[in-house]
A protein has these predicted regions:
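Soluble FAD-dependent oxygen oxidases
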Residues: 1-517
Length: 517
């Protein structure tokens, strides 16, 4: 019977023939004790695309969003179904391969790639919207570029990230801050249930009533710790058009007015439950596109009328030097791009270092002047600081209800330092980042946002999870006892003795509830 093969099936046949032919010249690195027959078997069993070091496009496939810490995977598997993931886990176990899990490849510290096996779930991106029950079910590889329009068709919304190519798997497991989080909560707060495949291939469903410790841990405990996230069910919210806003203050020659603006933003919006319908990201950047001056940019998304917006921002507009750069109404996905895209205006193919710290106390105008002056010493004009505004629904969510514990902060203060071959200052950027955050320690509450990991972060266990870290270790040992998913900042390291004393345990050790399929 005549039948047609897909292009991928044709490619797979050619790969298997190459691996099994007597004259094949595939070189397997000596550190891997794997036969060519095993590779051919894996290629044949996997439904999705398998990329080997000799495959066309390998160099592009192995790269992450940032690629500061490049890896050379032995194999990359684009899972086309859940069985592909199960096969990969067994293959990695038998052949003692390190595993990295990847969805959107947006890990700041490149933790979604390794020199062993990369399991990529970006092809798993089904979406089912149930507007009548205010829920959406998505697979782990779904990007916000796909999810936002699917929700907007029904006039619905889920808080999401600033970059549309981010996928829900990594984003949700680190918490997930977005422009509407002050009104609707952190992304992981909206999770009602998820399905995960554990390292032994078994499936678990976690929600407030089943596997409750895992439900708590995954929502903030970061990816690559407990298992492979397969799908998530979220609560969603009605949302129509919103306003996008940008106001700038120049501090190239005098930081006074810009510092007053930062202080006003803090006092008027970020302390207490003030104006939650105003989402805030305040940036320090160099305006390369216009006058090359350093500026403060108040970026915002507002849910309400123009008159209400004008009333809310009146205090900011009264500060000398305030310049409206954008004021426009549109869909959330458009506003999100308008407010954040292109700041700073960096060339293509740049790399970056990123790091964050949380601020809980009110800073003075003099404090902000000092921060602005330090920012002026950044290595190049691509550098930026983003002060993500907290408060509102973010801080109303109980601290112990998920492992995203940062509920007392006024802002997440994070820095991105970009560099490329032309700037030729990678190490200078890395060292300046350390100096900057040593300076910022006087203002910090000692914690950092786990979705912005930095490999130079000392004491990340306390910085990301504070007094709940030990509960995360216990939960990981329960669901991933062999520590199959491991990387530099994976859960499992020890705390300082004084931090150990402050640890809070939340759950009894109930048995794992497995699914029957």
């Amino acid at each position: 019977m005549k039948f047609h093969l897909t292009p991928l099936q044709i490619e797979k046949r050619a790969t298997i023939q190459r691996l099994t032919a007597q004259e094949n010249r595939v070189d397997i690195p000596s550190r891997f004790k794997i036969t060519k027959e095993q590779l051919a078997s894996l290629e044949g069993e996997i439904c999705g695309k398998v990329v080997w070091p000799w495959s066309p496009g390998y160099d592009a496939d192995k790269k992450s969003f940032n690629d500061v810490f490049p890896a050379n995977p032995f194999v990359i598997v684009y899972a086309a179904c859940y069985q592909d993931i199960r096969i990969c886990l067994e293959f990695a176990k038998v052949n003692q391969l390190q595993i990295a899990l990847r969805s959107g490849a947006h890990s700041f510290a490149d933790y979604s790639v390794c020199d062993g096996m990369v399991i990529d779930v970006s092809s798993l991106k089904s979406i089912y919207v149930d507007p009548a029950n205010y829920t959406v079910w998505v697979e782990a590889g779904t990007s916000f570029a796909d999810l936002n329009p699917a929700l907007e068709f029904y006039g619905m919304h889920l808080p999401g990230g600033g970059c549309p190519t981010v996928c829900v798997a990594g984003y949700m497991q680190g918490g997930g801050y977005g422009l509407t989080s002050r009104n609707f909560g952190i992304h992981s707060d909206c999770v009602q249930e998820f399905t995960m495949m554990l390292a032994d291939g078994r499936l678990v469903v976690a929600n407030p009533d089943q596997n409750t410790d895992l439900f708590w841990a995954v929502r903030g405990g970061t990816g690559g710790n407990f298992g492979v996230l397969l799908s998530v069910k979220y609560k969603i919210f009605p949302l129509g058009l919103i306003w996008g806003l940008q106001i700038t203050w120049d501090f190239e020659n005098d930081p006074t007015n810009a510092a007053k603006a930062l202080y006003a933003i803090q006092e008027n919006y970020l302390t207490g439950y003030k104006h939650p319908k105003l989402g805030i990201e305040t940036l320090l950047f160099t305006d390369i596109a216009t006058d090359n001056h350093r500026k403060v940019l108040f970026g915002a998304g507002f849910i309400g009328t123009e008159a209400e917006l004008n009333s809310v921002i009146a205090a900011l507009m009264a500060i000398p030097g305030a310049t409206i750069r954008l004021k426009k109404q549109g869909k959330y996905s458009d506003v999100n791009n308008w407010v954040l895209e292109g700041i700073p205006d960096v060339p293509p193919d740049v790399k970056f270092y990123g790091r964050s710290t949380y601020i809980s106390k009110s800073l003075s105008i003099a404090d902000y002047v000092a921060i602005l002056n330090f920012f002026k010493t950044a290595p190049n004009s691509y550098s930026m600081v983003d002060m993500e505004g907290y408060g509102g629904e973010i801080n109303r969510y109980p601290e112990n209800r998920s492992s995203f514990i940062h509920r007392k902060a006024t802002m997440d203060f994070f820095c991105l330092l970009f560099f490329d071959k032309a700037s030729n200052d990678q190490e200078k950027n890395r060292l300046w980042m350390i100096q900057f955050f040593n300076f910022m320690s006087r203002y910090s509450n000692g914690h950092s946002y786990q979705n912005y990991p930095n490999r130079d972060q000392v004491g990340f266990q306390w910085a990301y999870w504070g007094p709940y870290y030990k509960q995360l270790v216990v939960t990981k040992n329960k669901y991933n006892p062999d520590n199959v998913f491991a990387y530099q900042q994976a859960i499992g390291g020890s705390l300082e003795p004084d931090q150990e004393k402050e640890q809070i345990m939340l759950f009894d050790n109930k048995p794992v509830v497995y699914e029957s399929y």
